[in-house]
Design a protein with these regions (language model features):
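Glycine-rich, aromatic-flanked loop segments that form ligand/cofactor-binding clefts
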Residues: 2-5, 33-75, 109-118, 155, ...
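Outer-membrane beta-barrel and related beta-rich outer-membrane complex signature
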Residues: 122-124
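Aromatic-lined carbohydrate-binding/catalytic grooves of carbohydrate-active enzymes
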Residues: 1-33
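Catalytic domains of carbohydrate-active enzymes, especially glycoside hydrolases
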Residues: 1-9, 100-109
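Short metal-coordination and nucleic-acid-contact micro-motifs, chiefly zinc-binding Cys/His arrays
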Residues: 127
Length: 180
């Protein structure tokens, strides 16, 4: 039996009910072929409560598979590590993930990691930063301008296109300045 285990990014560690999900289907972790942690919990841990933890929008494998559902910066670049929380399909996925976990009898509560937008510096799991970014550049690069985010921002009276143009201008000014 394997003694050392390396987690598989973007997978779930329980048997998902695929019917709960929409276009984003959870990826089942291969460790489930050997051991179902959630199913076997009551058998081995009779007096211990189980608190589940799940990652919501920080999911590079899902982002690679669904780049149209990712956060986009002011330049239109997708952040494949961050599914856009304003997208209806992403919201459906997160709700289904929580519902699926909550349906497991041994689960007492669920802790959600990254239920929303990520800061730019959190980023990809193996990012390299060759250009030192000041706080303002990092904050501006973290803003999402996906079609879904812009549509929802506009519905709240935000001038999303003007804001996006301003952000692009500020970032271009930063990158052209040579101050980094």
């Amino acid at each position: 039996k394997q003694k050392i285990y390396f987690p598989v990014d973007g997978t779930v560690y329980f048997e998902p009910n695929q019917q709960l999900y929409g276009s984003i289907q959870p990826k089942r972790n291969p460790v489930l072929d050997q051991y179902d942690f959630f199913r076997d919990w009551p058998k081995y841990n009779k007096d211990l409560r189980l608190k589940a933890w799940t990652v919501c929008t920080h999911n590079s494998p899902q982002g690679l598979e669904h780049p149209e559902l990712c956060v986009r910066n002011a330049f239109g670049d997708p952040y494949i590590y961050n599914l856009c929380p304003a997208n209806d399909e992403v919201q459906h996925y997160v709700r289904a993930l929580c519902q699926d976990l909550a349906s497991i009898e041994s689960v007492e509560c669920i802790t959600l990691e990254t239920p929303g937008y990520l800061p730019f510096w959190h980023g990809y799991h193996h990012e390299f930063g060759f250009v030192p970014l000041d706080f303002q550049a990092q904050a501006l690069l973290a803003l999402c301008f996906s079609a879904d985010t812009k549509r929802k921002a506009i519905s709240f009276g935000v001038h999303a296109d003007s804001l996006q143009n301003w952000v692009v201008g500020r970032l271009n000014q930063f990158f052209a300045s040579g101050v980094y």
